[in-house]
């Protein structure tokens, strides 16, 4: 009787371990069979050159139309060029999406070399770039388009999440599914110091701009996880230094739903002193393993102008 009872207890344990070993063996086999993966993102992800190199991201630039010329974002035009042109001509650029043929030309060499390609784009509410990538994926096998539902380093968080999973050996299909879910957890917002660029771009009236300047109002632009739509969530009042501290406190203080591995401070051209104020405010309210400081590219810069700054992180 004693041996029989022990046998009954022992058998389920053996079965459990056998099933577990078989499961992980199968997963290991799946990972081993997975094709090598090339990670691609459009130029609006605003990752630093160091992070682009670390994650081996292949960047495909959006087009920037300024004056009578068309440029490649981040290649032959940068935010300071936009600011200089605006000061002289009071004209802002217009960005143009990457089309399907451009995507196909960009990814085909990687696919023909035997790779899968994960391509992450700016939010679909902000550009037709994602739709172009989706249409390209219908023409070829092995291309996995992901709508970041964001912009700037909110989008950059999504790229890094994909890069982490590529490094872990996951297959492309699984990465695409997991990362698409993460896009709903990215929290991105920016403080705008001056409404001049928003007014010039048709995003606020002259009256609103004048009132904001007189009252020293600084709007917080928040990015929705529904395609990356942007809207005003709160209007702060006071000097920029004071507003930035209050803004960081509003985003971080007392929260327990934030992933604390990394956070971005992303700006469109601002003083080192103000970056230091924001970094100190972050450290006051929450510990992050990494605080990345990056310069926003042409998209955010042409919308909001200089002295725009945001913190961007991921919720659990």
List the predicted regions and their residue ranges.
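Short, Lys/Arg-enriched N-terminal segments with co-localized hydrophobic residues
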Residues: 8-32
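Generic low-polarity alpha-helical segments
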Residues: 11-13, 20, 123, 197, ...
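Mixed-charge interfacial surface used for oligomerization/domain docking
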Residues: 35-36, 44-54, 58, 63, ...
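N-terminal glycine-rich anion-binding loop in soluble enzyme alpha/beta folds
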Residues: 37-97
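Short catalytic-loop micro-motif centered on adjacent basic/acidic residues
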Residues: 39-40, 94, 119, 145, ...
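Class I S-adenosyl-L-methionine
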Residues: 70-139
């Amino acid at each position: 009787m004693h041996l029989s009872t022990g046998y009954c207890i022992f058998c389920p344990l053996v079965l459990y371990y056998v099933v577990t070993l078989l499961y992980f063996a199968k997963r290991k086999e799946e990972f081993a069979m997975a094709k090598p993966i090339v990670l691609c993102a459009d130029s609006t992800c605003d990752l630093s050159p160091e992070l682009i190199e670390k994650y081996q991201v292949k960047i495909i630039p959006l087009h920037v139309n300024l004056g009578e010329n068309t440029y490649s974002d981040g290649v032959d035009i940068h935010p300071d060029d936009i600011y200089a042109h605006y000061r002289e001509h009071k004209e802002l650029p217009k960005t143009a999406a990457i089309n399907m043929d451009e995507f196909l030309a960009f990814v085909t060499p990687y696919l023909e070399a035997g790779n899968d390609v994960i391509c992450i784009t700016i939010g679909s509410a902000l550009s037709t770039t994602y739709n172009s990538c989706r249409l390209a994926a219908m023409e070829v096998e092995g291309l996995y388009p992901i709508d970041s539902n964001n912009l700037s380093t909110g989008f950059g968080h999504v790229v890094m999440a994909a890069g982490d999973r590529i490094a872990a050996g996951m297959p492309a299909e699984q990465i695409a599914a997991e990362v698409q879910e993460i896009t709903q957890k990215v929290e991105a917002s920016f403080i705008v110091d001056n409404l001049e660029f928003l007014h010039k771009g048709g995003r606020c009236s002259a009256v609103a701009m004048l009132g904001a300047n007189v009252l020293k109002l600084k709007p917080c632009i928040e990015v929705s996880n529904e395609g990356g739509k942007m809207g005003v969530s709160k209007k702060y009042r006071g000097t920029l230094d004071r507003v930035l501290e209050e803004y960081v406190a509003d985003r971080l203080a007392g929260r327990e739903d934030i992933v604390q591995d990394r956070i971005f401070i992303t700006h469109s051209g601002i003083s080192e002193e103000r970056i230091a104020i924001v970094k100190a405010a972050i450290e006051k309210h929450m510990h992050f393993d990494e605080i990345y400081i990056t310069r926003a590219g042409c998209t955010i810069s042409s919308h909001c102008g200089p002295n725009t700054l945001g913190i961007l992180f991921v919720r659990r």
